[in-house]
From Swiss-Prot:
Compartment(s) where it occurs, according to its Swiss-Prot or TrEMBL record: Cell inner membrane
Protein name per Swiss-Prot or TrEMBL: p-hydroxybenzoic acid efflux pump subunit AaeB
TM annotation in the entry: 8-28, 34-54, 64-84, 88-108, 118-138, 149-169, 367-387, 404-424, 429-449, 453-473, 480-500
The species this protein was found in: Erwinia billingiae (strain Eb661)
GO MF annotation: an example: transmembrane transporter activity
Functional description taken from the UniProt entry: Forms an efflux pump with AaeA. Could function as a metabolic relief valve, allowing to eliminate certain compounds when they accumulate to high levels in the cell.
Family: Belongs to the aromatic acid exporter ArAE (TC 2.A.85) family.
Gene Ontology CC, one term: plasma membrane
InterPro entries, sorted: PHBA_efflux_AaeB/fusaric-R (IPR006726), PHBA_efflux_pump_AaeB (IPR023706)
GO biological process, any: carboxylic acid transport
Keywords: Cell inner membrane, Cell membrane, Membrane, Transmembrane, Transmembrane helix, Transport
Membrane topology summary: Multi-pass membrane protein
First-listed, main subcellular location of the protein, grouped into a coarse class: membrane
HAMAP family: AaeB
Length: 652
């Protein structure tokens, strides 16, 4: 049996039991919030990771939950103070706040959006709970208690991780950076040999995903300890180098489509030999550097030269990452990075739809609840807020809503067993209560790390409906109201997601592809500050988004990669410096920007035709000013690419 698979269930059980004990020991009014928080922080991170989560990821999620809770409590108190005499307006403002938070959370990094999503539904939960209890004057006390209980739950989850063998991401990083470079070499082998196009596509898309994942591990590592600061600096540079290796290899393949003789025979012979580990790469790089020195730069393809330089720098940083040693003078030269450009989100319409879904779902639910006085309304409102706030940030919100619905359905019989049979029998013994909840948490932990659908929702839903109040009372009617309310709330959230369809997929894809086009056009510049800007991480981040939005659509990925290659080549090209070309570069950028900004296909088509005509004129100007081949060739390739894929870039 793989005993390490039991590590997370033990952590989850300890966190839940410890938060329960602390909650009852300090006489908290609703200890279940502490228990639920420990379950959500530890369980949600494990569900996302598909196993025992890294320590950094768990702590990061915990900190975001604290921030989101405080923001939500402040917003709830502000809204209640301002609209204390108008309950309907109060609920409407809370729904607007939830929608605003979801809209903003959809525009920022998904790692940090958790805090905003939480802030949105925390305010709604506080207002709903206070209204359900019928005493608005208790709102400040309720907000303070909620913050305290959530902090207790988070501390318990982090403490459990620290006690039971915390899983550091460092060893995974060490293994991945070695394996990544070996696979980068294999991609270059295939590109030099001009092998099967489908195999090349499979390799580079896999490398893009792994490079993105490796960059995510860097964030988890920094959450573990500040002693990894030097590794963080190296990994930032390593991310750009890995992306540069992919770009140079793909360009080598692309050039050979039109120039079979691009790679000299000696390099074909060199890359025929296979590599198995990082030691083989070291040996190959030493030989390659000698071959390039002997052959001379004029007889060595530019892409191969750039690839070898990037791989050599990668090896230099790799050693420092393994040892966490002080940064040497040579490394410092490599780490003198260019300013990294950050692009604004391409999912503005997707974010707007998410915000509208949240607002509509919570507003309709709250108005129906206030109008009818429905006993299960508060439970339904809580689940509506939670699902619409959290599910909307996921790549597949419908699947997450179904997961919660299945979980809440399972929670009804499971919660009934605990609430009506097990818990009344353990009223005289805290030990028996802890054992009974611990067994459920342990089994749930095993299923959660397997990503069993409905498990996380079922565990959280069960803990929510068995109340765990202090003092404990057993009101079966209230229990059934809560159980049915949260199940109905999940169903209504699922219904809203189905009715308000997200039609932004094609628009987002078109914006992303046109941004690749703009980046390639904007690279044609004689402005040194603009040429120094590092667009590569941002461009590949958008390519990664394209991979997720259109999985399996290899043609779109090829277009994007071709435009990224064009951007990198034009960025390094020796464009003649004169006022005429500089003015024309500005005109090209303006026209490309108009293509992105156009709101109709007709306008977009007109501006695109104008851009193609301007590129033809620009090529004539380059010939007139005797521009070298390393300028005219990539410009011609860019113009041909835009003509070939014109329809795709205008309308997906």
């Amino acid at each position: 049996m793989q005993w390490h698979r039991l590590r997370f269930p033990i952590k989850l059980t300890f966190a839940i039991v410890l938060s329960l004990l602390i909650g009852f020991h300090f006489n908290l009014e609703t200890p279940r919030w502490a228990v639920m928080t420990a379950c959500i922080v530890a369980g949600g991170t494990a569900f996302a990771a598909g196993g025992d989560p890294f320590s950094g990821a768990l702590r990061h999620r915990g900190m975001l939950r604290i921030i989101g809770t405080f923001l939500g409590c402040i917003a709830a108190l502000t809204i209640m103070i301002a609209t204390i005499r108008a309950p309907a307006l109060m609920m409407l403002l809370c729904c607007m706040w939830a929608g605003l938070c979801v809209w903003l959370s959809s525009l920022i990094k998904i790692e940090n959006s958790y805090a905003l999503g939480l802030a949105g539904y925390t305010a709604l939960i506080i207002v709903v709970s206070v209204d359900a209890n019928g005493s608005v004057l208790l709102a400040p006390q309720f907000a303070v208690e909620r913050c305290s209980e959530i902090i207790i739950g988070i501390v318990c989850a982090i403490l459990a991780d620290m006690l039971f063998s915390p899983r550091s991401v460092k060893q995974d990083i060490d293994r991945e950076i070695d394996a990544l470079l070996v696979d980068q070499y294999k991609l270059m082998q295939l590109c030099v040999a001009h092998g099967d196009k489908e195999e090349v596509d499979r390799l580079w898309t896999n490398l893009v995903r792994r490079t993105t994942a490796l960059n995510g591990m860097r964030g988890n590592l920094m959450m573990e300890s500040s002693r990894w600061q030097k590794i963080d600096e190296r990994m930032r540079a390593l991310n750009t180098l890995s992306l540069a290796l992919i770009t140079q290899a793909a360009e080598t393949y692309l050039i050979q489509d039109s120039r079979k003789e691009y790679v000299p025979p000696q390099f074909h012979i060199f890359f025929d030999k296979s590599v198995e580990n990082i030691g083989d790469i070291h040996k190959r790089m030493k030989i390659m550097r000698r071959v390039i020195t002997t052959s001379g730069s004029k007889n060595t393809p530019v892409t191969l030269q750039n690839w070898v330089v990037a791989a050599t720098r990668y090896l230099l940083l790799l050693k420092g990452i393994h040892t966490n040693s002080s940064i040497s003078r040579i490394e410092r030269e490599v780490l003198k990075d260019e300013p990294v450009v950050k692009m604004r989100s391409a999912e503005s319409r997707h974010a707007m739809i998410n915000g509208i879904r949240t607002f509509v779902a919570t507003a309709v639910g709250s108005l129906f609840w206030l109008w009818t006085g429905w006993a299960s309304g508060s439970g339904a409102m809580v689940m509506l807020a939670v699902i619409t706030a959290l599910a909307m940030r996921m790549p597949n919100p419908l699947m997450m809503a179904k997961d919660f619905l299945y979980g809440m359905i399972v929670a009804i019989p499971l919660g009934s067993l605990y609430y009506m049979v097990i818990m009344p029998s353990t009223q005289q013994s805290m030990l028996l209560l802890c054992i009974s909840l611990g067994v459920m948490a342990f089994i749930g932990g095993i299923l959660i790390q397997r990503r069993q659908i409905g498990t996380l929702g079922g565990l959280v839903g069960t803990i929510n409906i068995i109340t765990l109040d202090n003092p404990m009372t057993f009101n079966v009617t209230a229990f059934l109201d809560n159980a049915l309310g949260q199940a109905i709330g999940c169903f209504l959230a699922l219904l809203v997601i189905l009715l308000i369809r997200d039609t932004s997929k094609a628009r987002t894809g078109r914006i992303l592809l046109n941004r690749f086009m703009y980046a390639a056009v904007a690279a044609m510049s004689t402005n040194q500050a603009r040429r120094r800007e590092n667009h590569l991480p941002a461009l590949y981040h958008q390519l990664f988004m394209l991979l997720n939005i259109f999985p399996g659509d290899i043609d779109k990925f090829r277009i994007a990669l071709t435009l990224i290659i064009g951007h990198q080549r034009l960025r390094d090209a020796d464009i003649p410096v004169n006022e005429d070309l500089s003015a024309y570069h500005k005109q090209l950028r303006h026209t490309a920007d108009q293509v992105i900004a156009a709101r109709t296909d007709a306008k977009r088509h007109r501006y695109f035709e104008q851009l193609l005509a301007e590129l033809d004129t620009y090529q004539g100007k380059l010939v007139h000013y005797d521009a070298p081949l390393n300028v005219t060739e990539p410009v011609k390739r860019l113009a041909n690419t835009l003509k070939k894929y014109q329809n795709t870039l205008i309308q997906i």
